Amino acid sequence: MAEKEEGVKLIGSWASPFSRRVEMALKLKGVPYDYLDEDYLVVKSPLLLQLNPVYKKVPVLVHNGKILPESQLILEYIDQTWTNNPILPQSPYDKAMARFWAKFVDEQVTMIGLRSLVKSEKRIDVAIEEVQELIMLLENQITGKKLFGGETIGFLDMVVGSMIPFCLARAWEGMGIDMIPEEKFPELNRWIKNLKEIEIVRECIPDREKHIEHMMKIVGRIKAV
C-alpha cells in the first residue's frame, strides 16, 4: 500500500459532483489523501473560507501547502503531478476537445439542468425538452465508444459522470422525471453501465436514496426563495 504523500488533502462534500470527480482522479492515480467533508450549503466553515475566499465552495485541493480550487483545474493538476494512469488525452486536439465538452457540461448542462428543477408544472415540458437537446449532443459524442476516454476512464468521463447520471439525473428522478430514457439515449445509457463497472466510480458514487433526498431538499430551498 502506498504511503500517504505529505500534504495531500481534499476539502469536499459527499453530495457534490465536483468533489466526487476529484476523488475519482485521486483514486485512479493511487494517491492517498486526507478528506474533510463540508456541509457548505448550511454553513461555510472558516477553513473553507480561508482556503477558497474567492468562490467559497468545494472542492479545494491542498498539496504540500499549495491551494487549488475548481474541480476541472484540480483534475488537470492531478494529471500533471502524478503521471501514471493519464486522465487527459495525449493529443493536443483531443485534450482541447475534452476541455470544451467538460466546460459545456459544467456551464450549459448544469445551469439549464438546475433551472429545469424549479420550473413550474406548466413549463416543465419545455424545460425537459431544452435539457434533452443538450444531452443529445453528448449522446452523439459517445456513440461507438466504450468511454469518453476510450477504453479507460478519463477526464470527460469523470466530469460528465459525476454531474449528469450521478447527480442531475437523481434530482430529476426525485421529481418523477426520467431525463435520460434508454429509448432516447441508448449510447449514454450503455456508457453509464460501463462507468458503473469501474471500481473507483462505484466507490465515489453517493448512496442513491440518500442523494436523492439531499437533492430534493436543495430543490425545496431554491423554490422557497
Curated annotation (Swiss-Prot):
GO BP term (any one): glutathione metabolic process
Entry keyword set: Cytoplasm, Detoxification, Phosphoprotein, Transferase
Phosphothreonine modification, residue list: T152
Residues binding glutathione: S16, P17, V43, K44, K57, V58, E70, S71
Record localization: Cytoplasm, Cytosol
GO MF terms held by the record: glutathione transferase activity
Keyword Transferase: yes
Pfam families to which the protein is assigned, alphabetical: GST_C, GST_N_3
Record's catalysed reaction(s): RX + glutathione = an S-substituted glutathione + a halide anion + H(+)
Regions that span the bilayer: none
Residues in GST C-terminal domain copies: 91-218
Record has Cell wall biogenesis/degradation as a keyword: no
EC number: 2.5.1.18
GO cellular component assignments: cytoplasm; cytosol
Domain GST N-terminal intervals: 6-86
Function: May be involved in the conjugation of reduced glutathione to a wide number of exogenous and endogenous hydrophobic electrophiles and have a detoxification role against certain herbicides.
Family, similarity comment: Belongs to the GST superfamily. Tau family.
Descriptive protein name: Glutathione S-transferase U3
Species assigned in the record: Arabidopsis thaliana (Mouse-ear cress)
Designated gene of the protein: GSTU3
